[in-house]
Amino acid sequence: MSDDPSTNDALGTLRAAIKQAVTDVRGQTPLAQSFTNFVTINLVANAQLAAGGTAAMSYLPDDVIATAEIAGSNYINVGTLLPFFKNALPEIARKLHENGKTWVLDPVAAGIGETRTAILESFRDVPPTIVRGNASEIIALDAMWGLADADSTTPATRPAGVEAVDEVDAAVDAAKRLARHLAKRSPVGAGAVAVSGAVDLVTDGERTFRLPGGSAMMTKITGAGCSLGGVTATYLAVAEPLVAALAASLLYDRASEIAEVKSDGPGSFQVALLDALWNVTADQVAASDIIETN
């Protein structure tokens, strides 16, 4: 925290923007299209609806490109891959970039497998507007894109599937580099990276925030991170990248805390999470703990 009045004013302005984003999503029901993995597609769509948005799910490149023309934003998740995705996803990313469309990337299991690596490497020059992942995925993507000097890159300890083996603190520099890279090529002139963990981190490359809270039960259901990526895309349809990433992460922190109290285990937690996403107020989200760091 800072006692600097200018810092406090800036944080107050940010809170107001977060509140407005939550309000706008529920008032406008924006469409965020998802090309997401097979395991979690149902939860992603339901979470987008519960947050107040509209969902569209597709795997056909021509469908995705056509729907992007009417969608407010888009979401690509590389969690489960088929052979044709190796050509389809780079083409989709190129078209989104050429057409000035915003999108969110979840680089699930970055660093594992030649196909996934080739796809993620292809996004470097036509990148998303927001990247959301765990610490290991963020570190791996930063390394894939060659954004760090060789002597300053901190590689992930080992590939870990969809689970992080690195702490959020280890991904701070990688997240900042990625965010600055996204901003340089973004159709809206800005980008953001959200790193999920015990204490989430969100950065636009210039300002960095830590978000305490949330529930450890999020690690006991499949698709929590994937659905957060989808909801981040929902917010990106109405807000600039930093605000969208913060609003989605904070919404999930508050909703997961409520869901944990109301559930008896993973099954009821998932149901309670959807209910909480629906019921958490804009004021509750905006009033969450937000710690600005260097």
Curated annotation (Swiss-Prot):
InterPro entries in alphabetical order: Hyethyz_kinase, Ribokinase-like
Catalytic reactions on record: 5-(2-hydroxyethyl)-4-methylthiazole + ATP = 4-methyl-5-(2-phosphooxyethyl)-thiazole + ADP + H(+)
Cofactor(s), names only, from the UniProt record: Mg(2+)
Organism: Bifidobacterium adolescentis (strain ATCC 15703 / DSM 20083 / NCTC 11814 / E194a)
Protein name: Hydroxyethylthiazole kinase
CDD domains: THZ_kinase
BP GO annotations: thiamine biosynthetic process; thiamine diphosphate biosynthetic process
List of residues binding ATP: R132, S196
Domain of life: Bacteria
The enzyme's E.C. designation: 2.7.1.50
Function, as annotated: Catalyzes the phosphorylation of the hydroxyl group of 4-methyl-5-beta-hydroxyethylthiazole (THZ).
Family designation: Belongs to the Thz kinase family.
Sequence intervals crossing the membrane: none
Keywords, in A-Z order: ATP-binding, Kinase, Magnesium, Metal-binding, Nucleotide-binding, Thiamine biosynthesis, Transferase
Pathway linked to the protein: Cofactor biosynthesis; thiamine diphosphate biosynthesis; 4-methyl-5-(2-phosphoethyl)-thiazole from 5-(2-hydroxyethyl)-4-methylthiazole: step 1/1
Residue positions binding substrate: M57, G223
GO molecular function ontology, one term from the record: magnesium ion binding
